[in-house]
């Protein structure tokens, strides 16, 4: 059982997993096992149309301008808390957790595919279906995908809760810097 969570006053979120026999104590909480900011596998929809690693060096001049021409905004969005207002010299909004609020997005579990006997049909690709489900797809890691108002579609290992990836669509790049300022200017991004 998976539950998306959020704290409205601070606009932070979490993803919890429960055993169906014990719905009181979580098996894991995603924010307890989040990778360090610079270790997160974050991608974004670049101006070029390709997905690129969400790093300052990968941004075009126009994309850097969207983020205010400072790498500290990107660092904040990756989860760096150094420049949050609670710290000396901090200028960005405090967050309870680095995972954005998961309000109207339900976690979607993606596991190994079921054999739906598509191989018996004659449309393109049908004959290779059995090879697909009996190959690498059979042992793929179960993943949970959920959209957050931190502007990312997150992918978590469903067994451990560790974030495996995050994707920021190009369409939400422009409002992201407003998330650093105040909860009153918080953009509702990926729901």
Tell me the role of every PLM-derived stretch.
Residues 1-191:
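A fold-level detector for beta-propeller and closely related beta-sheet-rich head/sensor domains
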């Amino acid at each position: 059982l998976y539950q998306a969570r959020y704290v409205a006053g601070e606009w932070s979120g979490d993803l919890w997993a429960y055993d169906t026999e014990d719905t009181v104590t979580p098996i894991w909480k995603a924010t307890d096992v989040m990778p360090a900011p610079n270790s997160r596998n974050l991608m974004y929809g670049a101006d070029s149309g390709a997905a690129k690693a969400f790093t300052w060096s990968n941004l075009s001049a126009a994309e850097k301008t969207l983020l205010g021409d400072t790498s500290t905004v990107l660092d904040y969005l990756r989860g760096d808390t150094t420049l949050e207002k609670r710290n000396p010299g901090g200028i960005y909004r405090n967050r309870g957790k680095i995972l954005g609020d998961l309000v109207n997005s339900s976690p979607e579990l993606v596991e190994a595919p079921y054999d739906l006997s598509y191989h018996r049909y004659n449309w393109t690709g049908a004959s290779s279906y059995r090879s697909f489900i009996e190959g690498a797809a059979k042992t793929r890691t179960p993943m949970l995908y959920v959209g957050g108002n931190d502007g990312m579609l997150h992918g978590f290992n469903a067994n451990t809760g560790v974030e495996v990836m995050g994707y920021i669509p190009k369409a939400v790049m422009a409002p992201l810097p407003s998330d650093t300022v105040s909860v009153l200017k918080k953009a509702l991004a990926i729901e």
